[in-house]
Amino acid sequence: MDFIITIILWILIILFLLNEVIIRVVGDAIVNMKASEHTPFTVDEITQDSISLSTTINVANEGKQCATIMDCYVRQLLPYEQFDGVKVEAKAELKGVPREDDYFEAVLIQKKESIDIVIRVKLIDRKNNDIKQTLTHMVDLPLDIVNQHAARYPWKISKETIVLTSEEIAKLADIKLAD
């Protein structure tokens, strides 16, 4: 009986090692979100009480296998304790495929190809009903872009952070920051 268990264990070890060798030879997907190279933010819309901004981030598959981006979302990092003048709404969407429900539909990235993801940020005035007046006191706005991706390996979650500075926001809103 011990002999059979030993044989089964050796077979499992050999299969595991063989799988590792195959993955190394065949390769895998390497997903690279190039957040640090995002396009400059632009104004999509400005109203009395809000401003909508967007930027585009390239996501490249630099590996040898197809990758799946299963989810991508934006987490704004502006607590009310730091600045309570605006409510921040942020989302990610595949370029050219806008969705009203804020759902990010899974997308394949073939080997050695890339896609563009649009990051949309809306700043809504919470107090004065005048976004330009409120933004004169705005602080830097960190944004975490989180994506879940998979290929031959088990799924992974990756996060990149970009910062929308108060100076950028002031320039886009055509205002001057308060001292």
What residues fall within each predicted segment?
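Generic structural hydrophobic/aromatic packing signal, biased to beta-strands
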Residues: C72-V74, I117-I119, L143-I145
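Generic structural detector for well-ordered beta-strands
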Residues: N58, R120-K122, V163
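Hydrophobic alpha-helical segments
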Residues: V74-R75, T134-T136
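Acidic, serine/threonine- and proline-rich intrinsically disordered appendage/tail regions
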Residues: D2-I4, A29, E93-D102, V107-Q110, ...
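N-terminal signal-anchor transmembrane alpha helix of single-pass membrane proteins
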Residues: M1-A35
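Short, surface-exposed loop/turn segments at beta-strand-coil junctions that are enriched for proline
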Residues: K122-K132
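N-terminal topogenic membrane-targeting module
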Residues: I22-E113
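Short Pro-Gly-centered flexible turn/kink motifs
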Residues: Q110-K122
